Amino acid sequence: MKDLLNLLKSQGQVTEFDKIRIALAPPDLIRSWSFGEVKKPETINYRTFKPERDGLFCARIFGPIKDYECLCGKYKRLKHRGVICEKCGVEVTLSKVRRERMGHIELASPTAHIWFLKSLPSRIGLMLDMTLRDIERVLYFESFVVTEPGMTTLERGQLLTDEEYFDAMEEFGDEFEAKMGAEAVQQLLMELDLVEEIKILREEVESTNSDTKLKKLSKRLKLMEAFKDSGNAPEWMVLTVLPVLPPDLRPLVPLDGGRFATSDLNDLYRRVINRNNRLKRLLDLSAPDIIVRNEKRMLQESVDALLDNGRRGRAITGSNKRPLKSLADMIKGKQGRFRQNLLGKRVDYSGRSVIVVGPTLKLHECGLPKKMALELFKPFIFAKLEGRGLATTIKAAKKMVERETAEVWDILAEVIREHPVMLNRAPTLHRLGIQAFEPVLIEGKAIQLHPLVCAAFNADFDGDQMAVHVPLTLEAQLEARALMMSTNNILSPANGEPIIGPTQDVVLGLYYISRDRVNAQGEGHVFADTKEVMRALGNKQVHIHARVKVRVHEVVKDLEGNVEERTFIADTTPGRCKLWDIVPAGLGFDMVNQNMTKKAISKLLNTCYRILGTKETCIFADQLMYLGFREATLSGSSIGVEDMVIPDAKYTMIDAAEEEVREIEEQFASGLVTRGERYNKVVDIWARTNDQIAKAMMENLRVEVVKNRDGKDEEQGSFNSIFMMADSGARGSAAQIRQLAGMRGLMAKPDGSIIETPITSNFREGLNVLQYFISTHGARKGLADTALKTANSGYLTRRLVDVAQDLVVNHIDCGTEEGLLMTPLIEGGDVVEPLRERVLGRVVARDVMNPLNQDEVAVEAGTLLDEVWVAQLETMGVDEVLVRSPITCATRWGVCATCYGRDLARGHQVNVGEAVGVIAAQSIGEPGTQLTMRTFHIGGAASRASAVSSIQIKHGGKVRFHNAKHVQHKDGLVIVSRSADLAVADELGRERERYKLPYGATVTVNEGDEVSGGQVVATWDPHTHPIIAEVEGKVQFGDMEEGITVNHQTDELTGLTNIEMLSSQNRPSAGKDMRPVIRVLDSKGKPIVMPNTDMPAQYFLPGGALCGLKDGANIGVGDVIARIPQESSKTRDITGGLPRVADLFEARNPKEAAILAEKTGTVSFGKETKGKVRLVITPDNSDDNYEELIPKWRQLNVFEGERVEKGEVVSDGPLNPHDILRLKGESELARYIVNEVQEVYRLQGVKINDKHIETIIRQMLRKVEILEVGESHFIKGEQAEYARVMEEIDRLKAEDKMLPQYQRLLLGITKASLATESFISAASFQETTRVLTEAAVTGKEDDLRGLKENVVVGRLIPAGTGYAYHMERRRQRADARGPEAPTMDEVEAALSEALSSSGE
């Protein structure tokens, strides 16, 4: 019998579903949901508190107020279940049906649904091909619309004002029909013949040529097709029946004092019902048209307000002038249903408290206050107490726990043994913000946290709080232990380096004992082993810093597992021996025989993890921490004012600087330098002085001179506390010490400009009032910045997570050969990121050949490059590797494990089911708070330093050129190509330096030459842009007429004459169409042809160019024909930090972006139009020219007759990512975005693996634009999901049909999130109304593929351990296309049978 009850219960709720579909509800469906019509606006009788009949809370419609009890009290209790009381009409059942039973209101006149009217683009407008204004005028009864033109001159859908309507009535009588209001719109929608309309539209799309028209038509066509395919009828966008929300979801609560607290929805419903009833009455009375019309308009407005208040006109406000919260407001925004209740829920079995440090804990433990544990583990304690027979009932057990008897504590200790708890610190910016620990019961009320996990939580002990959560089920405990335990999260998922490295005190302690001191007690002693050292230390026979010799036995293991043992005598100190004692076997002694700075310790831990694995590393990290804390305490390091040693040279330096400044002031006074130059020079002087003082100060702090054993002076590392803290990396930096003991330096004004008088004193000397005041700007700005930064960074993370949330590893290998070409990142003379770091943990896409022997395969395709492989690549001198990447992965939904490569947090190939999208988003978003918010103004030193005019080699090696076209000249090679690079390779052929070569640079070395460090290999003039002759001969001027197209100028100093071209606006009208040109002729006076082409050598000179030649002069190859002065380019602000990252991921078009060549070919200039230059590119083999208009003020880098490659820069500026994708393809785009994002993070010293950024880029490239339809079902110009297009192409290939043509689109992360296939995911992100409207109209189905959708519907997510569950369900679904679930009839039959048998 009990089972049957459960069966009945479960029949009501559908739990097994595979998709969710959203569509328009037809009136009949709304009526079928409803349990009765709400006819009265009354809610509750204020005296009896009982709901009014037929009102908004009517018990007959919505169900009883008390469980199993009708309203009048005739039927009570369970035995009358299901009876309908004949007196009050209430069904006897559970009161919770008031949460699920709906009612309805029959509207006296149809009403348009505001979402489909006002949510842009207006769906009703698109369907009827009318503008929103026109439809609104019809709906709100301002004009008539013709619904049936009959045999008249009027057209269907034409608007008529009152006068026009009466005129038409007089003219045509009853021939035509025109109406107003929603009825008219409904009728027009009803009469649409979708099939016919679609046919007409498709023909129009084919025939149209204008782009705007095509856009409009395809929008309409798409909507029509959506209606046709989804089974929605257009007239359902106009409501005739309004559903009423169940009353318990819009409660009315009596407060004391006879007042009621009510949900706003009740007010809105009351309005609708009042107006509806009034309208019914007016219609019954057949009131005058104008009154009825007004009432209908008011009804329309009240329904609008109920659905989405404030969307049209002024929002309806309540008694307190606050707009009422409508149905739409309930679901959107941070406080709406999606984000407040579905994506984030509060959790049971949790608590929070302040955290304090727990230096005695092991890495996997946390201290949990007994009081908290008792509360959190209550059910487990009750069960144990009952099981032991200590309590007879749960109630008794509860009493015992409240009394806190001794047995309870014993049982608590048993219960929590090996039961992990999860600790979380808000804000949880990455997955390491929640980790599992085994609780250790402690007295007190604060949670104890292990110091080494603070970095992962970003926690400190200045009052931070943390939350504790208890995993209840066995599975949850298992996952917490296997996946979330702090000992399993040693590496950071962002970059694969240890995140549990020691910091602060621990670093200081370890650094202190690893230092050595001259002439310390026991110097020069020799010890047999480290144990002997320890004894000597204990007996105070030797100082911890003494330089001694010790016999060391080490066992070294390498990455491949080979073990090597050796014993030797090492020069070391007792302190380092102490450290060596806790180092696990397998690591070499040289790793600890050095000053243990933070970097060295981190490296030690990393090596330990890679060679010895997790367990050893955890034990070692704990030991390091205990040792570090102990030794830091014993060292007695502290800070005193005396430690801030001010260098003696400071005051002389400041005097010298002031002298220089005085000189510049005098020059300014006598007019030799401009105001701007003076300012820049002064700022430069002070910046330089500051650096010099800082240098002197650090030198002063770094070393101290002491007497050695022989009584001579010897330098040793200083034991100054402040210096030690900074040097070890424990706390502080050179910049901070500079402010304490050097000079504070230059300060900025609130607007960001630098104040030219610096603060010359430091904190030890103290600041005077003016200096203090100047300092306050920066301090305030810093605080305001931090607050803004946190919000911005959080929003960026949210957008990233949203765009990448459905990206999960779902295949082992997709089998593609595509990939990205990885090269070392070289900027100027420095290798910023060597190849080994870039390819570590990636899979090789194609065989890598050995550079020393081209036939030998060095690494086979499909190899996962680990540390061993990477080292081999480096020794072979491999310079570039094609590796698999998430961007080029061919998996349809998700990515494959091979393209992703190594799971950074685990160090092996990524598992299937790993949510790599979310990990990528967190890795990029989490350091967001460390980025700066400001945009850098270029000023002072920066703007002048940028005028580089030569290349000086740093290290030396072999010269290589890249894309360099050059001609031979007497001074050397002259570069005549745009994007040339000069690289220097080392003896293994690996590039170590790389420099840009501008057009016109003179290079003094050849390809393959050996150069040495410090050699200058190229020079150029940074202030002019030359035009270089590529042939030799005689010069002939064309169209150069004095005063018309050119002016002669003579330089007073040198006496040389230059010819200056006049720009077209400065010429007299005679010269408007003339084009100054220099041709090169041979000795016979014939034009010379350019090498390798059939084009004559002629150089057109733009306005402003200066030419120093005379007509008829001889020129040689590589000579300068003319120079174009570069106006110092407008100083652009460099956007840095967080805003830059956001711009890149949002794929925003930069202002004044660089102009790229759209085709490969030859450049010429066509006819100029007003203010614009016409650039023409003629491809070599075809004659379809490409033309583009470019504003005159843009400086062009190309000359007439020059060849450009597709995608080459024609005019400088910031690059536009959309152009890169269109002209150079995905891999070039990926390289650009990855490098730009990395540059921002690198400046802040944040390491993020490239693959995270690539993962996000993959999601930004999800959409394609259809260029040609082929025989597919797409529409020309529509944006479709890339995976869908590939599926369609597979289908068409199989059927041997014409394939569609498409081009990849780059969408910004916000756009991409909203354009996802899943409407649940998009609606819970932003613009909920728009997303839901669109989804409903198109009858969208959500396949519940991503993580977000599954969280919203309350399922396990299809990632991690939930992935298996989803795969299993998918398999079952495929099997179970067979028998159906039992119908209601079968259930009833079974029920009656069971009842009859139990009745016997």
UniProtKB/Swiss-Prot annotation:
Catalytic reactions on record: RNA(n) + a ribonucleoside 5'-triphosphate = RNA(n+1) + diphosphate
Record-linked Pfam families: RNA_pol_Rpb1_1, RNA_pol_Rpb1_2, RNA_pol_Rpb1_3, RNA_pol_Rpb1_4, RNA_pol_Rpb1_5
Entry's EC annotation: 2.7.7.6
GO terms, molecular function: DNA binding; DNA-directed RNA polymerase activity; magnesium ion binding; zinc ion binding
One GO cellular component, as annotated: DNA-directed RNA polymerase complex
Positions annotated to bind Zn(2+) 2: C814, C889, C896, C899
Domain of life where this protein originates: Bacteria
Subunit-structure text: The RNAP catalytic core consists of 2 alpha, 1 beta, 1 beta' and 1 omega subunit. When a sigma factor is associated with the core the holoenzyme is formed, which can initiate transcription.
UniProt record similarity statement: Belongs to the RNA polymerase beta' chain family.
Protein name: DNA-directed RNA polymerase subunit beta'
